[in-house]
């Protein structure tokens, strides 16, 4: 039985609020796709692998694979489609003719344990379709589909207007996970049908079920959660830390003897310092990517966000790319009143283009006012959102009345950033 593995990494991660596609978001020093490859290391099973990535990210993915595997042999990295279903349809074309069974896996489920892959492969010996599922722990409520889309769009905490609610027994329902396994011929036939009917399905099991009702279910795993929203990154960080603490985790080996253990890349460290004085202006203060009403604005060609500027210089310094002034200029029309988020997001893209990823930034704010502790967590999240979910730590201190900062003439910030090169 010749098995192929299709890794879907073409999702843009819009709900993750990341400037990078989801597969290339850093968690614990590695991108999600690298964790996915790392977790496959214990399979010891010969697999032919195809990876679908967004347009323009083939080269970056190749670097990820080389760092994880040391080789591109048996790996094909191709550009995916506009939807998950399109990416699957494109990806299955790249497997060699000898492949008779296919596993389809979302890279967003980067921490799926090896035993789940092995269980799916084992069941494919006697089944045409195999789906890992996990019990639902929450109570289930059913509403009209159009009502659901409208109500969810209203945002967290907002009351539903619809009253058409059915209360379902959760014991009858399970959540589907990946990898999902299929006979190759069955999956290809299901895709041909979906193209002909112009239908879109939530996943491959739903699509295959249109022509094959006999689908085998196996128990999935809690670690096979899907990274979808920013809060999922905290869970992913915990999973990454757990894996790094295990000495028996080795890099993925698809068809060759084990290679040396994947080591964490050495961090590159940069320091950024910035100061701005207060001015009399009707505009509000901008600090740490937040607007602070009823506080004096900081002077600057841009919005004067001293925290964002210090972080930007720290990141550029770590990458040996200069500082905020040398990269963005000091008086360009394009950066007039530019926000701190603009500088951080632009720097994040610049780093990513050059193969860097942000690990974390620690920032010390020096000022008498405003009181940063009141909005510290909010500010950390705002900066993190600009940097693909990187960890941010903000703290503040005064000078006990000494110097121009002690006299309340302005605000200073010192930032230390850690990045790594893929």
Swiss-Prot record:
GO MF terms held by the record: 2-C-methyl-D-erythritol 2,4-cyclodiphosphate synthase activity; 2-C-methyl-D-erythritol 4-phosphate cytidylyltransferase activity; metal ion binding
Region feature 2-C-methyl-D-erythritol 4-phosphate cytidylyltransferase, mapped onto this chain: 1-267
EC number: 2.7.7.60, 4.6.1.12
Span list, region 2-C-methyl-D-erythritol 2,4-cyclodiphosphate synthase: 268-422
PROSITE patterns in the record: ISPF
Site keyed Transition state stabilizer: positions: 15, 22, 301, 398
A Pfam family matched in the record: IspD
SUPFAM superfamilies recorded: IpsF-like (SSF69765), Nucleotide-diphospho-sugar transferases (SSF53448)
Reported cofactor(s): a divalent metal cation
Site (Positions MEP for the nucleophilic attack): 170, 226
Keyword vocabulary terms for this entry: Isoprene biosynthesis, Lyase, Metal-binding, Multifunctional enzyme, Nucleotidyltransferase, Transferase
Pathway(s) per entry: Isoprenoid biosynthesis; isopentenyl diphosphate biosynthesis via DXP pathway; isopentenyl diphosphate from 1-deoxy-D-xylulose 5-phosphate: step 2/6; Isoprenoid biosynthesis; isopentenyl diphosphate biosynthesis via DXP pathway; isopentenyl diphosphate from 1-deoxy-D-xylulose 5-phosphate: step 4/6
Gene Ontology biological-process entries: isopentenyl diphosphate biosynthetic process, methylerythritol 4-phosphate pathway; terpenoid biosynthetic process
Record bears the keyword Metal-binding: yes
InterPro entries attached to this UniProt entry: IspD/F (IPR026596), IspD/TarI (IPR034683), IspD/TarI_cytidylyltransf_bact (IPR050088), MECDP_synthase (IPR003526), MECDP_synthase_CS (IPR020555), MECDP_synthase_sf (IPR036571), Nucleotide-diphossugar_trans (IPR029044)
Binding locations of a divalent metal cation: 274, 276, 309
Residues given in the record as 4-CDP-2-C-methyl-D-erythritol 2-phosphate binding sites: 274-276, 301-302, 323-325, 404, 407
Cross-referenced HAMAP family: IspDF, IspF
PANTHER family reported in the protein's UniProt record: 2-C-METHYL-D-ERYTHRITOL 4-PHOSPHATE CYTIDYLYLTRANSFERASE, CHLOROPLASTIC
Family the UniProt entry places it in: In the N-terminal section; belongs to the IspD/TarI cytidylyltransferase family. IspD subfamily.
Biological role stated in the UniProt entry: Bifunctional enzyme that catalyzes the formation of 4-diphosphocytidyl-2-C-methyl-D-erythritol from CTP and 2-C-methyl-D-erythritol 4-phosphate (MEP) (IspD), and catalyzes the conversion of 4-diphosphocytidyl-2-C-methyl-D-erythritol 2-phosphate (CDP-ME2P) to 2-C-methyl-D-erythritol 2,4-cyclodiphosphate (ME-CPP) with a corresponding release of cytidine 5-monophosphate (CMP) (IspF).
Name listed for the protein in its UniProt record: Bifunctional enzyme IspD/IspF
Gene name for this UniProt entry: ispDF
